[in-house]
Amino acid sequence: MYFANLPQNLRDYFQFPLIHGEWDFLAYEDETFSYQEVLNTSAGLAHVLIDQYGIKKGDKVAFSMRNYPEWIYSYMAVTSIGAVAVPLNSWWQGEELDYGLTHSESSVFIGDEERLQRLEGYVEDIPRIAVRCDASKFTNTVGFNDVVTPNEAFPEVVVDPEDDASIMYTSGSTGYPKGVVSTHRAVVSAPETWALMGQLATQIEVDGEPLASPISGENPCTIAAVPLFHVTGSHAVFLLSLVTARKIVFMYKWDPVEALHLIEKHKVTDMTGVPTMSAEVLQAHKDNPEIDISSLKGLGSGGAARPPEQIKAQEKEHPDKVATVGYGLTETNAHATNASGITLYERPSTAGYPTPFLNLIKIMDEEGNDLGPNELGEVAIKSTCNFRCYLKNEEATNEVLDSEGWFRSGDVGIIDDDGFLYIKDRIKDIVIRGGENIACLEIEAAIYEHPSVREASVFGVPDERLGEKLATRISLNPGKELTEEDLSSFLAAKIAKFKIPEYTWFQNDELPKVAAGKIAKKQMREDAIKELGLG
């Protein structure tokens, strides 16, 4: 099911802001750009991609950088000409960026100085466009401002709803990140539906309070606190802002006190981030009560489960700021369930209710049979927003997408008698640290490359701030020694910093095993939680 009058593609979707083109759209430090300026710069980049790089419909263009306005220009330019946007994780190191570029077969890379430095020595045949830095320091690279001239119109390209729009990489239990391919219809459907449901929810009051905070209306404004390479950032922040005429304020890096100052300066009305951000910004305000954040009416979270205690505290201490939670995955374009206001306060552990019209949620057993209310099983989602496939991985696609369009999420949960979803566990061997999905197998593979390591097991342990932290227990080869510092230095060249385990135990004997001979990861996790006093 989909909306009949939905824009046919992202190119059409980007035309919404033209009715108020002079309004502010992006703010970064001392720079402010109107909707019209953003569209014109994006159109200018689109012409460069076609005229200078020969990009045509279906070609892939990758980009990776901090949350800069150029990220927005890149996404809009690429998708508007029928090419496929490949936003790569800006925390990745050189090997990881190389994998994303090679696997996606990207023809051009757009990046800032940090990313270009990490890519030195990798895929040098791919031309690069440098953002906010000196392009002459890098090979095969030109400067963004040297080649992009604003243009009032995008190049004429026919883009169909079922054409591929994006490839976003997500960590999976198999180790290597999987490229999640989504169509224009799937991507556009997500923000359109949020906007519609948000408008409806603000009109409904329970006990005198609205079910949701307004995301549109008079001078709506949000902060891009989460990375744009995640669907929470790209969809719930960026794309949703286009249809709601919302201004986006960029941060160079997350800092809760700086967020308070930006809220005061720009009169920010709502903020969406991982749960840690919501908690930290409210705690920062306790410590800095002189900063005026009265404009802030909504605090939403996604990317990881928000602790019920946080929601209860927000309701009690900040009743004027409506709490919202959402559940979705890269494979569903961040779309599945949500809850806010009184519906959330009455059941703070819920992941929300399926979004009407577009989403169906059910619980399945291992054989794929439907389960009833309050029965524990795997969460399955059927939605117009679901992805099309995993890039170059038909086997993995078929494992999670059936012929009727149901996506098996890998999350374990229940649906209560009222239809609300509760996430209880994960089937997949993944740790979610501050909203980042980390495949344990990927980290284990990197650890195994060290010559002193005989066996390694990586798992997550609870953390109040980040949700989970990475831990590892390692069995050393006979006669070998290894310190936590040496291991961290070894891994730093191979994987992103956030993937390096924060708790490490070494032992000389073998790791414990279950009856089948597999490493007893569950037991080690339980032992670690006890030892750390987290149970």
Predicted regions located by residue number:
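AMP-binding/adenylate-forming catalytic core of the ANL superfamily
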Residues: 92, 109, 271, 383, ...
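Conserved AMP-binding/adenylate-forming core of the ANL superfamily
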Residues: 24-56, 62-68, 72-76, 93-98
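Gly/Ser/Thr-rich phosphate-binding loop
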Residues: 172, 243, 265-273, 284-346, ...
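Conserved pre-ATP/AMP-binding loop-to-beta segment of ANL
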Residues: 22, 151-169, 176, 212-221
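ANL superfamily adenylate-forming
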Residues: 30, 114-161, 176, 185-188, ...
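Structural core segment of the AMP-binding/adenylate-forming
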Residues: 80-146, 478-480
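Conserved AMP-binding A3 loop
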Residues: 34-36, 165-193, 197, 201-202
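Conserved AMP-binding/adenylation subdomain of ANL enzymes
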Residues: 188-224, 229-269, 284
